[in-house]
């Protein structure tokens, strides 16, 4: 047998992390004390009293705490998990050398002991069991027996939840000096079952938690409020405005305190010295803008942090105090006995106590595509010698983050949280998020508006500067006043740029998404990827599973039979067949079809049926308090059979029944087999029992029992048609049918069947064993449809969304249930998976529009269906709950996984988790998706209207003024900008869905953000607002008989402008031509609150703003003018909606404006006239649809480029990933694919996949093996879900 040198990676088999390429390197975690305990050398070693640390190859020494300091730290931190990261190696400065070799050998770890440590094993030693996999170390600690002894756990009963603070300390020598047999016998019959018990949690103060920690990662370092405010202040325009404000303040202070006062010509008294007020007011306004922006971002981060925590948490089954308990994955501790099964993503590191055909996909960790079959620790010890580090067929290790494909088992937890492999890797990969597609679309519009606004601001500055220079000779003012006038021109121009460049526009969608995802949780939609919320708004097709989604997943056996003549049905059910459906009901009556039919079964048949159901099942049982009746957890089909066994066959304890027989081999259910099986020894014979799809069971059965006895058997051939008729009759009644069969072997392994020499623990292959079976019986299982599904399907159809059923049931059952749900129509097509799969691409695309039901489908069929629908231009949402559904969930535009019945793999592959597994929740997701898109459009419509009015009003009034001053001052414009960018977004982005959103067809993918209805409202309202404000400014005094004092009228203009925006905000609550703009406004408290707050602040500004806001108190007539003109915008909006669009298309320059926007925001459009390339981006504001991740990055970079150059600030964070391309290009071409391959995405229980990641990582660590030396370069690694895609394709 091969051996592997610990110092030579080339001889080591593929492992979780090679010593040189892992990130972080194992040397950072090995050779460090597992907690703050004193450390000493085993007396059996050379006699030295302390361990000296080996220097790493880089020359750095690993930190070593003294005995006293560690003891003091431990005493001080009792009750708090130790901070292991404080002991991490300082070798990060030279990762290339530090990661090349472990600093602490296994021998050192085995002979290192810790005084006062309650457990024998340190965290570094437990990590070395699996990183890399090391069976020789398992031999050294005496296998599973030594491991359990060192962790103080009995695998038959689990840990105690009332674990004491251990007075007796366990040393490594106690384990190494134990010469007894390392094989540990686990007494499964000791396990009793118990329901979820809130008391079954390990205390945070226990030694186990203190020493090894909990299965929780530290919270992501979120940005604090001050940091977010500083980032908001990085806006280049705000910085420029701040500089101007400081200069203005300095000049104002000089004028106030350094110049003689100016006398009032009427009173002769000195005028108030307020020259400094404007500078202070501008700075105060900037502080308010920055503060509000920072608070807004801070609240958004808090919401997403809550979302991440909810996504990461799920329940697991553990063995504690001798009973099975359901607990949060966050409560797992080292020493727990964890139950795992197919579909789970392993949340911790551990060693297998028991394995029932466990097969894992470890590609996300090792990069190796082959699936790994696991064995328990005892078997691994038997198959290897102590000098062999690793053999592929003797692998008992489960690594956190890997996926269980088949089987089930029990796991002894050896590492949790930051000490597990997944935890260490995740902590090294935490990063910032990226922009969503809707943010990308908005950024393009923002860029166009920014260019127009920037041009307007520059034009204003140039015109005013020319006018200022022309008048300079005739200006008799002092040089200070001239400087103040010039500064006023600069301030007004810069402030106009603040208003005109919509920094808040690309970020407004984040607010809408944050609100929507938070509210969607209440509707049982847990959004994992933000873009899924947007995409659901354009969904045109839903491909839904049947079980649990359309049905209640509350399965009950209501009919069935044993052999040819013992039939039964539930008292509450109808007779099991229907004459009109072609079945012979008289045959049932003659056979005694009643619940008492079970009494006709012979004892032997009854026992065999019980063992067939109990042993060939992966369900676990729980007992409610003060109840002897078990409750089962697991597959709903299996729980239905077990419930029937309890009720009719006298089953009392499934665990006791399983432990009473010797299970030789177990075949877990798979989509290929459509069945599961088990071989067990019973009364000196070996029974092979199978349950599964009745067609498969009947096909492999050559005989059938009769008269309720195993002794009477007849040939199956003469009864085949009868059973097919029965199964068809059940299917027409929407019953799921299962068949049971068995076979008896006289010896084990059987002599007449070829054995599998490669795996002695599983000697038989399924295809060899599953032949020549005897048919036992069949069962009809009812799963009623959810009461609200037919209405939900009807609502989808009214919303232009086609619903299709994709199920593994037979076509008769599928059509029956689809008809009840309203999915299957008279002109619809139903088809089975194999037939659908065999069609040509052209034929498949031809029948897809009418395909309502796809039965007997495989994961491949579901993928083909999705691909075909997408080729036809559809946006497809799909549901899935199994591991094999992962590829389809990833392929769909939006993947929905089941929160209750779904596997962890399916949840990880999905975009949204249905917490209640209910189809109606998908309909709510569609409504929320459309509402998010509507919210962004509402905000866009509002902001562009304000932009147009503010820009033109400022330019016209400033140019027409004799002193180059605008009617709206800098402080007033900043107040308007605050209303426009933040408060309006809060108000308009938080409208809940209305029934109207599901009464219209979905938008086409890539549709323009602007509709004609939006354009006509923007143009008409802007024209009205400009007309009102300009007339008031230039003719208001004469029309309303005000004195020539401009202060009164300027205040009225400012007040009117703000009230126009406030009432137009109400107007913008609707995007269509319907008149009721107040619909469901009482459901949006935030909108009402913001309206009242803004109105209140405006009143305070006018009354008390004074010199700071350049306003003067106005009389009642002035207030009436302002508010009446504002209110008129509401009936005007109704009038605009009533005008036919065809008429306005001829009058309004919508096409010209749209073309100008498109020309500005996209160079592809400008080159369209001289290019015939069909791939060039569409006209108008329709976004370019990228086809690769690189195109996404390029598109984001291009779209936000102009805004970022002008503003910077928070926008800069959307462009971080652009560094990736540049720095990757700096690498040698031969290294690029290898660097990317080294860095793969994995799942962590504590970190949501809801955000994409991009992390600054020393590149020398990633490419040290490839190149040997690359200096100190750093790159941004932007990694996506490649690992999961790879994992999903492997599953398929």
Swiss-Prot record:
It catalyses: Ca(2+)(in) + ATP + H2O = Ca(2+)(out) + ADP + phosphate + H(+). One of its GO terms (cellular component) is intracellular membrane-bounded organelle. ATP binds at residues 547, 638, 691, 736, 807-809, 856, 862, 884. Residues 68-78 have a biased composition (Basic and acidic residues). It comes from the Eukaryota. Residues 44-60 have a biased composition (Low complexity). SMART domains: Cation_ATPase_N (SM00831). This magnesium-dependent enzyme catalyzes the hydrolysis of ATP coupled with the transport of calcium. Transports the calcium to the vacuole and participates in the control of the cytosolic free calcium. Residues 258-273, 470-488, 960-966, 1038-1084, 1137-1292 are vacuolar. Pfam families: Cation_ATPase, Cation_ATPase_C, Cation_ATPase_N, E1-E2_ATPase, Hydrolase. Residues 1-236, 295-448, 510-938, 988-1016, 1106-1115 are cytoplasmic. Residues 23-41 have a biased composition (Polar residues). Its EC number is 7.2.2.10. This is Calcium-transporting ATPase 2. GO terms for biological process: calcium ion transmembrane transport; intracellular calcium ion homeostasis. Residues 1-105 are annotated as: Disordered. Belongs to the cation transport ATPase (P-type) (TC 3.A.3) family. Mg(2+) binds at residues 545, 547, 881. The active site is at 545 (4-aspartylphosphate intermediate). The chain crosses the membrane at residues 237-257, 274-294, 449-469, 489-509, 939-959, 967-987, 1017-1037, 1085-1105, 1116-1136. One of its GO terms (molecular function) is P-type calcium transporter activity. Ca(2+) 1 binds at residues 498, 503, 977, 981. CDD domains: P-type_ATPase_Ca_PMCA-like. InterPro entries: ATPase_P-typ_cation-transptr_C (IPR006068), ATPase_P-typ_cation-transptr_N (IPR004014), ATPase_P-typ_cyto_dom_N (IPR023299), ATPase_P-typ_P_site (IPR018303), ATPase_P-typ_TM_dom_sf (IPR023298), ATPase_P-typ_transduc_dom_A_sf (IPR008250), HAD-like_sf (IPR036412), HAD_sf (IPR023214). Ca(2+) 2 binds at residues 947, 981. It is a multi-pass membrane protein.
């Amino acid at each position: 047998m091969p051996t592997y040198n610990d110092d030579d990676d080339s001889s080591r088999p593929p492992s979780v992390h090679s010593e040189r390429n892992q990130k972080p390197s194992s040397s950072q975690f090995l050779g460090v004390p597992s907690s703050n305990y004193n450390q000493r050398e085993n007396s059996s070693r050379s006699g030295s009293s302390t361990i000296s640390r080996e220097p790493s190859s880089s020359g750095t020494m690993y930190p070593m705490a003294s005995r006293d300091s560690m003891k003091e730290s431990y005493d001080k931190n009792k009750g708090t998990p130790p901070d292991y990261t404080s002991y991490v190696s300082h070798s990060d400065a030279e990762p290339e050398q530090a990661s090349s070799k472990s600093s602490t050998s296994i021998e050192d770890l085995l002979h290192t002991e810790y005084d006062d440590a309650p457990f024998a094993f340190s965290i570094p030693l437990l990590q070395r069991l699996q990183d890399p996999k090391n069976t020789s170390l398992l031999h050294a600690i005496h296998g599973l027996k030594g491991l359990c002894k060192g962790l103080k756990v009995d695998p038959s009963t689990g840990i105690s939840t009332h674990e004491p603070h251990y007075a007796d300390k366990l040393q490594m020598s106690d384990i190494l000096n134990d010469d007894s047999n390392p094989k540990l016998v686990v007494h499964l019959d000791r396990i009793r079952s118990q329901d979820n018990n809130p008391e079954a949690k390990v205390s945070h103060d226990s030694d186990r938690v203190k020493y090894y920690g909990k299965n929780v990662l530290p919270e992501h370092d979120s940005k604090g409020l001050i940091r977010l405010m500083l980032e908001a202040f990085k806006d280049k325009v705000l910085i420029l405005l701040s500089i101007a404000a400081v200069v203005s303040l300095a000049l104002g202070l000089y004028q106030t305190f350094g110049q003689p006062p100016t006398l009032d010509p009427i009173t002769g008294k000195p005028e108030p010295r307020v020259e400094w007020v404007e500078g202070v007011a501008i700075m105060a306004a900037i502080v308010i803008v920055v503060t509000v922006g920072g608070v807004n971002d801070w609240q958004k981060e808090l919401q997403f942090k809550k979302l991440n925590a909810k996504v990461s948490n799920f329940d697991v089954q553990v063995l504690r105090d001798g009973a099975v308990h359901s607990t949060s994955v966050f409560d797992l501790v080292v020493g727990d006995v964890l139950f795992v099964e197919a579909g789970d993503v392993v949340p911790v590191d551990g060693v297998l106590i028991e394995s029932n055909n466990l097969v894992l996909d470890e590609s996300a960790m090792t990069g190796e595509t082959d699936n790994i079959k696991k064995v328990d620790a005892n078997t691994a010890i038997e198959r290897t010698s102590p000098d062999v580090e690793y053999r592929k067929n003797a692998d008992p290790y489960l690594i956190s983050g890997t996926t269980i494909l088949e089987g089930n088992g029990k796991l002894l937890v050896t590492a949790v949280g930051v000490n597990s492999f997944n935890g260490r890797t995740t902590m090294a990969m935490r990063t910032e998020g990226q922009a969503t597609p809707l943010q990308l679309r908005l950024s393009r519009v923002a860029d166009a508006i920014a260019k127009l606004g920037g041009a307007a601001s520059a034009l204003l500055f140039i015109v005013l500067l020319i006018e200022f220079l022309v008048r300079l000779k005739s200006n008799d003012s002092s040089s200070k006043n001239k400087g103040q006038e010039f500064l006023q021109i600069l301030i007004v121009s810069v402030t106009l740029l603040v208003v005109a460049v919509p920094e808040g526009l690309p970020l407004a969608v984040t607010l809408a998404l944050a609100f929507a995802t938070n509210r969607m949780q209440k509707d049982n939609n847990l959004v994992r990827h933000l873009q899924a919320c947007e995409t659901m708004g354009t969904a045109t097709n839903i491909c839904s599973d049947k079980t649990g989604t359309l049905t209640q997943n509350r399965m009950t056996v209501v009919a069935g039979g044993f052999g040819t003549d013992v039939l039964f049905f539930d008292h509450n059910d109808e007779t099991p067949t229907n004459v009109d459906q072609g079945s012979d009901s008289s045959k049932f009556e003659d056979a005694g079809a009643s619940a008492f039919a079970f009494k006709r079964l012979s004892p032997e048949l009854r026992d065999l049926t019980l063992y067939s159901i109990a042993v060939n099942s992966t369900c676990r049982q729980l007992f409610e308090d003060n109840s002897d009746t078990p409750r089962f957890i697991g597959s709903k089909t299996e729980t239905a059979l077990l419930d029937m066994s309890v009720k009719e066959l006298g089953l009392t304890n499934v665990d006791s029944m399983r432990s009473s027989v010797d299970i030789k081999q177990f075949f877990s259910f798979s989509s290929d087999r459509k069945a599961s099986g088990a071989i067990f020894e019973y009364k000196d014979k070996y029974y092979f029992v199978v349950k599964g799809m009745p067609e498969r069971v009947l096909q492999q059965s050559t005989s059938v029992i009769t008269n309720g006895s195993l002794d009477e058997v007849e040939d199956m051939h003469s009864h085949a048609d009868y059973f097919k008729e029965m199964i068809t009759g059940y299917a027409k009644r929407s019953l799921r049918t299962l068949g049971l069969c068995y076979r008896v072997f006289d010896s084990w392994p059987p002599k007449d069947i070829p054995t599998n020499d490669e795996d002695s623990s599983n000697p038989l292959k399924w295809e060899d064993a599953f032949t020549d079976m005897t048919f036992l019986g069949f069962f009809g299982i009812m799963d009623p449809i959810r009461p609200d599904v037919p209405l939900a399907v009807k609502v989808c159809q009214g919303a232009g969304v086609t619903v299709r059923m994709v199920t593994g049931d037979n076509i008769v059952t599928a059509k029956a249930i689809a008809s009840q749900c309203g999915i299957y129509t008279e002109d619809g097509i139903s088809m089975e998976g194999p037939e659908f799969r065999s069609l040509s691409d052209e034929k498949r695309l031809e029948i897809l529009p009418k395909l309502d039901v796809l039965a007997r489908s495989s994961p491949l069929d579901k993928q083909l269906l999705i691909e075909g629908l997408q080729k036809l231009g559809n946006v497809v949402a799909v549901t899935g709950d199994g591991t094999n559904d992962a590829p389809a969930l990833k392929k769909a535009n939006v993947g929905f996984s089941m929160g209750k019945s779904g596997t962890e793999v399916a949840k990880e592959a999905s975009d949204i988790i249905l917490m209640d597994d209910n189809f109606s929740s998908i309909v709510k997701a569609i409504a929320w998706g459309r509402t998010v898109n509507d919210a962004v459009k509402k905000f866009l419509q509002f902001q562009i209207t304000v932009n147009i009015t503010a820009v033109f009003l400022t330019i016209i009034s400033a140019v027409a003024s004799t002193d180059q001053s605008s009617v709206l001052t800098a402080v007033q414009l900043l107040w308007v900008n605050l209303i426009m960018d933040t408060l309006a977004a809060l108000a308009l982005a938080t409208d809940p869905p209305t029934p109207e959103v599901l009464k219209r067809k979905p938008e086409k993918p890539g549709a323009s953000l602007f509709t004609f209805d939006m354009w006509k409202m923007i143009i008409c309202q802007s024209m009205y607002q400009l007309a009102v404000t300009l007339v008031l400014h230039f003719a208001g005094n004469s029309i309303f008989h005000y004195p020539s004092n401009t202060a009164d009228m300027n205040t009225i203009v400012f007040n009117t402008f703000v009230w126009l925006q406030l009432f137009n905000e109400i107007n913008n609550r609707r995007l269509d031509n319907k008149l009721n703009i107040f619909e469901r406004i009482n459901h949006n408290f935030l909108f009402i609150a913001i309206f009242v707050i803004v109105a209140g602040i405006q009143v305070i500004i006018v009354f008390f703003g004074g010199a700071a806001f350049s306003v003067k108190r106005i009389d009642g007539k002035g207030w009436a003018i302002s508010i009446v003109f504002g209110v008129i915008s509401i009936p005007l909006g109704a009038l605009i909606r009533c005008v036919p669009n065809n008429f306005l298309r001829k009058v309004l320059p919508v096409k010209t404006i749209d073309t100008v926007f498109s020309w500005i925001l996209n160079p592809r459009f400008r080159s369209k006239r001289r290019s015939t390339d069909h791939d060039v981006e569409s006209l108008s504001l329709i976004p370019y649809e990228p086809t690769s991740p690189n195109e996404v990055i390029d598109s984001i970079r291009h779209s936000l480029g102009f805004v970022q150059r002008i503003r910077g600030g928070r926008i800069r964070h959307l462009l971080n990933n652009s560094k990736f391309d540049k720095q990757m290009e700096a690498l040698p071409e031969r290294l690029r694919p290898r660097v990317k391959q080294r860095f793969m995405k994995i799942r962590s229980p504590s970190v949501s996949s809801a955000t994409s990641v991009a992390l600054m990582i020393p590149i020398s660590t990633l490419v040290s093996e490839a190149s040997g030396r690359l200096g100190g370069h750093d790159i941004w690694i932007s990694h996506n879900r490649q690992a999961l895609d790879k994992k999903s394709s492997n599953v398929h």
